[in-house]
Amino acid sequence: GHIYGPTITETDSRASAQFTQNAIEGEDIVMKSAGMQMRSYCYVLDCASAILTVLLNGKSGDAYNISNKASVCTISDIALALAHAGGQKVVYENATDEEKKGYNLMSNSSLDAAKLEKLGWRACFDLEEGAEATVKYMKKLRG
């Protein structure tokens, strides 16, 4: 899944990282599409606990999807959550033909974490809580 949280760097080019940068810098988030592609997002602390769960309870050699079913949403949804957490808004603009060339055309890349959940793992942060924690902590780090 797509891991987000206060671990992003200023050079991180992922959409969620750019949205976070906008939110903590007091800028509106500009979307160059409707952002209707579905993605699996997972807050970084939930990701860490998922990895620990696999290390403690998983079967060696097996693969496990890390995904929070409460945070499977559109790209627009995460933009709105981060904008709200930062007191900003999301603005939708038309993309140039050049910008459209870089789009990921996959409409749904959400993951199923049922196998991980069978090991006893549960996410603690929904999308709004993760967005709030991310923006709050990043603002504190930046002073």
Name these PLM-found stretches.
Residues 34-36:
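C-terminal lobe/hinge of AMP-binding adenylation domains
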